[in-house]
């Protein structure tokens, strides 16, 4: 009998929690909208994106890690979503809190078509992240040789070095420098 009563109370508690009215707090609403927006980017939900675009939502909104919907969509391989964001005016040059861009994320994940599309934007090909690395260095490290040629054609310096002395050219040849042990 006790088990039955506890089960009944547990069900009643969950029901009461599920029936709470939506919040009118602007901060809560803003956070919920951000969550929907970023989840749409991860999933590639174009209908949801269209709703955000049509409502005038800021396409370059960043989460607590500095990720934009474009960075998330590129990283998760959502090509049509990336294209729609760029056509609607999203900024491909925005960096997350570590300084990485959508292009760097696409290269890291091996999303070559997305990376090629991002290369067609007006971003500096030698833009550096917080560790001093460029998109070309990512392409070299992860053996995305076809992208190295495109980055070079766009003006990327394949001999530029990060603080450790790595360059895209060295990384592409398999030479990786690491920090000296302390």
Placement of each model-derived feature along the sequence:
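Leucine-rich solenoid repeat scaffolds
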Residues: 140-182
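Intrinsically disordered, low-complexity regulatory segments in ankyrin-centric signaling systems
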Residues: 18-55, 64-67
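Ankyrin repeat structural motif
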Residues: 45-53, 78-86, 111-119, 144-152, ...
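Alpha-helical adaptor scaffolds
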Residues: 67, 71-83, 87, 93-121
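Ankyrin repeat A-helix N-terminal signature
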Residues: 39-44, 72-78, 105-111, 138-144, ...
């Amino acid at each position: 009998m006790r088990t039955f009563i506890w089960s009944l109370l547990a069900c009643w508690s969950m029901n009461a929690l599920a029936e709470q009215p939506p919040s009118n707090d602007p901060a809560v609403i803003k956070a919920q909208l951000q969550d929907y927006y970023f989840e749409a980017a991860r999933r590639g939900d174009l209908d949801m994106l269209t709703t955000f675009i049509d409502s005038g939502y800021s396409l370059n909104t960043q989460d607590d890690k500095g990720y934009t919907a474009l960075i998330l969509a590129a990283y998760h391989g959502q090509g049509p979503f990336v294209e729609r964001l760029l056509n609607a005016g999203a900024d491909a040059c925005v960096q997350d809190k570590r300084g990485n861009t959508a292009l760097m994320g696409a290269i890291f994940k091996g999303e070559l078509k997305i990376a090629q599309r991002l290369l067609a934007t007006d971003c500096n090909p030698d833009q550096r992240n917080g560790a001093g690395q460029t998109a070309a260095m990512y392409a070299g490290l992860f053996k995305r040789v076809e992208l190295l040629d495109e980055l070079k054609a766009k003006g990327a310096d394949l001999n530029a070095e990060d603080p450790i002395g790595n360059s895209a050219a060295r990384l592409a040849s398999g030479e990786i420098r690491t920090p000296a042990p302390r």
